[in-house]
């Protein structure tokens, strides 16, 4: 989707594309504090999504410290723009893209669901709906932690990169979720971001998943019958019907 070797994605299409109408596309952005993991760790989500008749894509991006988070945001936006332009070629509906991500992937998904403050119109990369799992929406608390050794954020850049302080006017319908056993900071940031979205008139649902923590909550997203899975597929139906 872009000029770098890291600018790749996996796009997996359901069998019903052969004769059917264009289907929704579910896009996942992996976590790893912007410095670890890859799209390979996301592919387990695809099976249930394909079984439901939807297309699935997992995005790769460059990692810190080779690049700054600003570039990662640009790369993910580029990937979304590419996916939105390629729907007619692959048989999915470019107007029915659901973007989801976990942890740092939720941060990146949020950044791909808003326009920068100077922009007056909706951007080409913004999806139809967003699902944010255990996300990070204010980055300044990370500055004085070991996580920032690779990120190299300043206070100013952390503020610029925080969805909590962004223009949310064009943000799509959103599900924000976190685990019962998350840290208080993850819970607080999720709730604060949801409040900001609702304050701007965005349709938002929140969900605390019982018994789940920062690392295993994503398994509930892959489970159609789990608490989060039910809300996830209900959102897809609501947005895409």
Predicted regions: what they are:
Residues 123-124, 129-143, 155-192:
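The feature captures the conserved acid-bearing segment of alpha/beta-hydrolase catalytic domains
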Residues 25, 50-62:
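A fold-wide structural signal in alpha/beta-hydrolase
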Residues 15, 32, 180-182:
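Residue-level signal for short, function-critical loop segments
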Residues 177, 187, 191-194, 198-241:
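C-terminal catalytic histidine-bearing segment of alpha/beta-hydrolase fold enzymes
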Residues 78-145, 159:
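Primarily recognizes the serine-hydrolase "nucleophile elbow" in alpha/beta-hydrolase
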């Amino acid at each position: 989707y872009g000029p770098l070797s890291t600018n790749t994605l996996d796009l997996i299409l359901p069998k019903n594309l052969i004769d059917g109408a264009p289907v929704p596309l579910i896009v996942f952005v992996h976590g790893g504090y912007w410095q670890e993991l890859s799209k390979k760790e996301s592919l387990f989500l695809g099976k249930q999504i394909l079984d439901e008749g939807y297309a699935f894509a997992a995005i790769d991006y460059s990692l810190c410290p080779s690049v700054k988070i600003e570039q990662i945001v640009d790369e993910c936006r580029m990937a979304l723009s590419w996916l939105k332009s390629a729907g007619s070629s692959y048989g999915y509906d470019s107007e029915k893209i659901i973007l989801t991500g976990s942890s740092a992937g939720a941060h990146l998904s949020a950044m791909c669901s808003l326009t920068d403050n100077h922009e007056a119109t909706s951007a080409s990369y913004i999806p139809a709906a967003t699902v944010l799992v255990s996300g990070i929406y204010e980055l300044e608390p990370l500055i004085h932690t070991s996580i920032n050794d690779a990120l190299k954020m300043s206070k100013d850049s952390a503020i610029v990169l925080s969805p909590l302080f962004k223009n949310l006017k064009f943000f799509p319908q959103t599900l924000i979720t976190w685990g019962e056993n998350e840290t208080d900071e993850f819970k607080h940031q999720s709730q604060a971001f949801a409040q900001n979205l609702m304050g701007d008139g965005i349709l938002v649902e929140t969900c605390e998943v019982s018994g789940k923590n920062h690392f295993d909550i994503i398994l509930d997203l892959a489970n159609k019958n789990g608490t989060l899975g039910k809300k996830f597929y209900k959102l897809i139906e609501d947005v895409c019907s």
